[in-house]
Amino acid sequence: MLKTISPLIPPTLLKVLAEMGHGDEIIFSDAHFPAHSLGPQVIRADGLSVSDLLRAIIPLFELDSYAPPLVMMAAVEGDTLDPSVEARYRDALSLEAPCPDIVRIDRYAFYERAQKAFAIVITGECAKYGNILLKKGVTP
């Protein structure tokens, strides 16, 4: 156990966060996301919500300030988004600094970004469109 680091962060995730460089991207996915078929390293965080993990890692993780650091999947045509999902994520990400805007991209563009991500963290999140990409910035 490490002091001041949330026990919600699995050791493998802590290692990945430390190994990431500026500009690297990580996905925090809902439980339904096809992470294992997309290619990058997969970390399991079953039983945890995305917002709980975001709240745990944001004190350790600098968001990119040169490019949009937050990306979520847009709803498929004819479907709807639950605005409370983004609101929960924004609240969690606002603990250290004001939360930057969240960019929405279509499902297949999100999958392409996920294939190139440093890692994908599968959570127990059950919210539809509950996936979020974080781009790492330079630590001041």
From Swiss-Prot:
InterPro entries xrefs:
L-fucose_mutarotase, RbsD-like_sf, RbsD/FucU_mutarotase, RbsD_FucU
Can you tell me which residues form the catalytic site? Answer: H22 (proton donor)
For this UniProt record, the keywords arranged alphabetically read as follows: Carbohydrate metabolism, Cytoplasm, Fucose metabolism, Isomerase
Q: Which GO terms describe its molecular function?
A: fucose binding; L-fucose mutarotase activity
Pfam families hit by this protein: RbsD_FucU
Which residues hold substrate? D30, R107, Y129, G130, N131
Q: Which GO terms describe its biological process?
A: fucosylation; L-fucose metabolic process
Reaction(s) catalysed by this chain's protein: alpha-L-fucose = beta-L-fucose
Q: Which EC numbers characterise this protein's activity in its record?
A: 5.1.3.29
Q: Which GO terms describe its cellular component?
A: cytoplasm
UniProt subcellular location: Cytoplasm
Q: In which pathway does it act?
A: Carbohydrate metabolism; L-fucose metabolism
Gene3D superfamilies, A to Z: RbsD-like domain
Source domain of life is: Bacteria
Which family does this protein fall into? Belongs to the RbsD / FucU family. FucU mutarotase subfamily.
Q: What the protein does?
A: Involved in the anomeric conversion of L-fucose.
Subunit-level organization: Homodecamer.
Q: What is this protein called?
A: L-fucose mutarotase
